[in-house]
Amino acid sequence: MKVVICGAGQVGFGIAERLASEQNDVSIVDASPRRIQIATDQLDVRGVVGHGSHPDVLARAGIEQADMLIAVTLHDEVNMVACQVGHSLFNVPTKVARIRAQTYLQPEWRSMLSRDHMPIDVVISPEIEVGEMVLRRLSLPGAVDTVSFGDGSVVIAGVLCGEACPVVDTPLTQLTQLFPDLPATIVAINRNGKVMATRSSDQIQTGDIAYFVAPADQVGRTLSIFGHDEIPAKRIIIGGGGNIGLYVAQELEKRNAAARIKVVESNRERAQAIAEGLSRSVVLHGDSLAREILDEAGVADSDTMIALTNDDRVNILSCLLAKQLGAQRILALVNEQGYAGFAHGLGIDAYVNPRQITVSKVLQHVRRGRIRGVHSLLDGAGEMIEAEALETSPLVGRPLRDIDLLKGMRIGAVVRNGVVMRPSGDTVVRAQDRVVLFALADDIKRVEQLFRVSLEFF
């Protein structure tokens, strides 16, 4: 696949890194020569210095042959115009635009971004995607990772198995016997930084992060089996009042009437601005790394501290300070995968990685076949995938035990007409079923083959 990416910042670089690693033909455009130099030095991509919405610059990037244009600069208007140019002058099949300003995304104005008005096929808002991930973590405090598929009917959750975890050293087949009525399936394990698909003979070890698939209404019960029955937070401190912090605070005010929210923002003008946009939250002007500010926010009595500034180090350190001062749980926004790798070891209860979240959103549209959802694990080592089974799919009409699935794949659930089914060897997938599965990176091409439209269909 030929892909042109406009914007070589954190988001654009992350997308380019992932797509290039999968042997796609990637060109990346940015006005900064330094960013292009970094991208071409570190990645197998073609770099072009220039304005991402200029036709001549896009032409130099090879837009005429592109299958997809991904515009993720920091400027919404540049992204919009780039998509318009890609459509009108170069007939690019798929256009993806990053939109940051919330006014464009309001329901009354969003139709402007539809194909009928502005030729944007996919709108991504990393700030909203990250904000929603934070909100999901708050609703499931026992999980270190979570995503929902099947129109919200299915949840995938990662859970840390500590020394007190009741199911450590128990074979997965025995778990099924112990809890026969629990419709949850463990599909993957992260062990010492390496992710693997599970088999029935596997045992969970202390320190593992187990990923399970369960109906949304059974996630709490499943977490309790792993020894996690934490109560969702009510007293919440948010460090950082940027777009993500403001979105999380606003949504908490709407969704959680019992929540008591404090927002700490270091910029005085920004603090005043977000205070005007919030109704029940208390906004404090100050540094979230300052002990006196955290004390003023009531950190000793808080349930959760969330650090959402643009600086990974500030987020990690402010969370650790908050925990030392009495916060029950801490959640940090971490952009650099290197920091994310040791976050749990430092005592960070959970973290969100904006780059990984955005890449997952883009991959949903890069993957071939009827792929409805993608959630990347461990910086691309594996993926949770939701796909629609077609009449011509090799999965349809045969018991799962007769399907030649690779060792790096594991089916976690089948959704039929809104009903979530736990898969067994006797399960027969039907056309239009939604299948939720895990696949290692090397086996994703096989997943695409299973869910692609066969030429025989036509």
Swiss-Prot record:
Membrane-protein topology: Peripheral membrane protein
Occurrences of domain RCK N-terminal (ranges): 1-124, 233-352
Any GO CC annotation of this UniProt entry: plasma membrane
Top-level taxon of origin: Bacteria
Pfam families in the record: TrkA_C (PF02080), TrkA_N (PF02254)
Binding residues annotated for NAD(+) 1, in chain numbering: G7, A8, G9, Q10, V11, D30, T73, L74, R98
Domain RCK C-terminal residues, every copy: 144-228, 372-453
Keyword field: Cell inner membrane, Cell membrane, Ion transport, Membrane, NAD, Potassium, Potassium transport, Repeat, Transport
PROSITE patterns in the cross-refs: RCK_C, RCK_N
Single Gene Ontology MF annotation: potassium ion transmembrane transporter activity
UniProt-annotated binding residues for NAD(+) 2: 235-266
Record-linked SUPFAM superfamilies: NAD(P)-binding Rossmann-fold domains (SSF51735), TrkA C-terminal domain-like (SSF116726)
Localisation per UniProt entry: Cell inner membrane
Function: Part of a potassium transport system.
PANTHER family in the record: POTASSIUM CHANNEL PROTEIN 2-RELATED-RELATED, TRK SYSTEM POTASSIUM UPTAKE PROTEIN TRKA
Record note on domains: The RCK N-terminal domain binds NAD and possibly other effectors. This is expected to cause a conformation change that regulates potassium transport.
Protein name: Trk system potassium uptake protein TrkA
Organism (species): Azorhizobium caulinodans (strain ATCC 43989 / DSM 5975 / JCM 20966 / LMG 6465 / NBRC 14845 / NCIMB 13405 / ORS 571)
Gene: trkA
